[in-house]
Amino acid sequence: MRKELCRNFQRGSCRYGENCRFLHPQQAKPNNPFGFGTQNQQQQQQQQQQNSSNPFGFGVQSGGSSRPNQFQNTWSRTASTPTGGGAAASTQQTGKQTQPADHKCTDPAACKRVMQDDFKNERPMWKLTCYGHWKYFPCDVTGDISYEELRAVAYEEAKRGIPLQSIVERERNLQNSKIAEFENFLRNPYKGSVTANQSPFAATTPSIFPQSSQINSPSPAFSGFNQQTAFSNTNAGGLSSSGPPNAFASFNQQTTFPNTNAGGVSSSGPPNPFASFTQQSNNQQTAFSNTNAGGLSSSGPPNAFASFNKQPNAFSVNTPQPVPSGPSGFQTNPSTTFKPASFGPGPGFATTPQNNNIFGQSTPTPATNTSQNNQTAFNFNVPVASFTAPAINTTNTSSGTELQIGGDPVDSSIWLKEKWNPGEIPEQAPPDAFV
């Protein structure tokens, strides 16, 4: 007994479902949900196999087996040199090993090969573009113009009445100039760039120590090794001096600082406030004048930086030129000349009975020898009470360390010691020079 089809089921409004007395035919869903195209049974089976093996629904499968690494990108550019041009740095596939592009920008030859390979294999169809041979470097060829911009300019020129032939000629010249720019860069890729062995500042700045001989004086103040300075051979007072005294060693070079006497004046100028550097000893020029223990020169003015025991300068080789003696510039009656402490127990301030002043005396009186003068003992190890303290007479003996207090000579070496041994502590009060 055949049942009739349920009309309500065909309309989609049957309320009985499976309990309905009429037939509810089961319609097979079409394989093509869009309703176009035909598929046979074999194609349906293949589609089912693909749906089971490939859930993404694309790719060709054979025999129901999945292909390994089906999403792996195995594309590689076949080139002899690594890439580095307008495209991003790609990787080369060798089997299953991926190697990054080896681009050595420090090697000009390698960079040029990369550029040649880029121009050969990756030259774009649109010529009005820019180019950079390395990913993170600035563009080597700049000035890119898009075709939209070129078209917009052509429209604007056409609106202004410019002939079409002129517009085309301008665009052709623009393209030819860009091609020429690329070719020039390929021939000379590093024009205008700074290499590792080239300084960006090509112009050399003049040195204050010129190599050419500018001054005839051969003695330097500090060792200059055959170099001459740009300073003139003058003294500190601005007056020229033709003498070649050396301040701190000489290797037959030009002085770094002006060649002067210590007073800053020439040999015929006013008195020298700090004595002269140009005293001679053993036929050699010394950096400091030869003085006795009192710090006064026997043949010249008082020297603030006196050499001791008449020892010549070990670095001096120049022939000395004696400078006329001059008294100390900072003097009163009696005047005290500032002198550094000696290596021995000698005094540092010397009192000379002179009345010369640096500001009014035209003819200096030469300083007398310390064997005929009394000096004030002073040492830098103790503080200075006053520069105007009353002078204490000293007697220049073999040791040079005796003071006369109340007419009696007193050994002053005991006051120069840093540490006293038992039994050496003096009973009397220290002299004013050591207070």
Swiss-Prot record:
Residues 25-105, 205-374 are annotated as: Disordered. Sequence repeats lie at residues 34-35, 36-37, 56-57, 58-59, 343-344, 359-360. GO terms for cellular component: nuclear envelope; nuclear pore. Its main location: nucleus. It holds the Pfam family zf-CCCH_4. Residues 2-88 are annotated as: 6 X 2 AA repeats of F-G. Keywords: DNA-binding, Metal-binding, mRNA transport, Nuclear pore complex, Nucleus, Protein transport, Repeat, Translocation, Transport, Zinc, Zinc-finger. InterPro entries: Nucleoporin_NUP42 (IPR051767), Znf-CCCH_4 (IPR041367), Znf_CCCH (IPR000571), Znf_CCCH_sf (IPR036855). GO terms for biological process: mRNA transport; protein transport. Residues 63-77, 205-320, 328-339, 351-374 have a biased composition (Polar residues). A zinc finger (C3H1-type) spans 1-27. It is found in: Nucleus envelope; Nucleus, Nuclear pore complex. GO terms for molecular function: DNA binding; zinc ion binding. Residues 39-51, 78-99 have a biased composition (Low complexity). Contains FG repeats mediating the translocation through the NPC by interacting with transport factors. Part of the nuclear pore complex (NPC). The NPC has an eight-fold symmetrical structure comprising a central transport channel and two rings, the cytoplasmic and nuclear rings, to which eight filaments are attached. The cytoplasmic filaments have loose ends, while the nuclear filaments are joined in a distal ring, forming a nuclear basket. NPCs are highly dynamic in configuration and composition, and can be devided in 3 subcomplexes, the NUP62 subcomplex, the NUP107-160 subcomplex and the NUP93 subcomplex, containing approximately 30 different nucleoporin proteins. PANTHER family: NUCLEOPORIN NUP42, NUCLEOPORIN-LIKE PROTEIN 2. This is Zinc finger CCCH domain-containing protein 16. It comes from Arabidopsis thaliana (Mouse-ear cress). The gene is CG1.
